[in-house]
Amino acid sequence: QIAQGGNTGEITNFAPLGTPEPNYSNDVPGDTSTANKISAEKMSFRLAAQNQSWSTMDLARELALEDPAGAITGRIGEYWATTNERRLIRSCLGVLADNVANDTGDMLKTVATDAAGAVTDAERINASVVLDAKQTMGDHASKLQAIAMHSVIFTRLQKQNLIVYIPDARGEVNIPTYLGYTVIMDDSMPAVAGANRITYTCVLFGSGAIAGASGRVENPSSRDRDEKAGNGGGEETLHSRRSDLFHPLGFSFTSSSVAGQSATLAELALAANWDRVWDRKNVPLAFIQVND
């Protein structure tokens, strides 16, 4: 729950029961069984209190015979969707950084290098690499349902005719898939240039991998005018405010390296701000790093 009047809180989750050997019944009255207990695991989270503003001059509207304020209003939803997608990706990068630093990289399969020379097939996206990443979840791998990748990686798979399109339930949209995983193509996915090569990071997502919520905002949107702006021509400013949470389940956001009230994109990607609290198999995320 979110702390009252604050932007931090905790998510409580009961741990799996495990598979201890059962008791075996007998006819001895004094031989009593000992009950097991279920433990609770807590994850800390931090909301992002965000805002953005856009201004338009009255004269520009009068000369163009168009309504820029209306155009802005119609695009605000897309702006926040894109912004929150970037925050989600940066959170995943922070989770990966923590995993490599503190959990032996047991969620990552990497074949990427920064070697000089041509990229080899073994260093590119391929079925073997994806399946090895899937295997980091062991017998829980069936939870994985989607893979997010940069458009460069998606195009390489297209060139090999490995993207299979499946119609949605209504038959109106063809959904791209690879190895049965729904493909999410996004150029916000990391493409980090080294001295010789680019390393691309892909993410396998499972159902329930990300928790999402919205906090209370006193004034989600507002407008104000400055009649003196433009030498008296007038200016209108539109303000939009949100309080959002996108949190990878199985990790606590420690806020160890957060300077302000909300974590920036750069702070979300820091290993120091994340700590895994669930067993690896219970976290439906896996990471892949390739050169092409």
Labelled PLM ranges:
Residues 1-7, 13-20, 121-155, 179, ...:
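Short, low-complexity, charged/polar segments at coil/turn and helix-coil boundaries
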Residues 1-50:
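Assembly/oligomerization interface modules of large self-assembling protein complexes
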Residues 4, 47-49, 56, 61, ...:
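Generic structural "secondary-structure junction" signal
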Residues 11, 39-103, 139-148, 183, ...:
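Long, contiguous amphipathic alpha-helices that act as assembly "spine/axial" helices in icosahedral shell
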Residues 29-33, 64, 72-75, 165-168, ...:
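Short, low-complexity, polar/charged sequence segments that are solvent-exposed and flexible
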Residues 34-39, 70-72, 78-81, 170-175, ...:
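Glycine-rich loops and low-complexity Gly/Arg-rich segments
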Residues 59-137, 267-269, 274-281, 287, ...:
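Alpha-helical scaffold segments that mediate packing/assembly in large oligomeric complexes
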Residues 115-128, 132, 152, 158-292:
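Sequence/fold signature of self-assembling virion shell proteins
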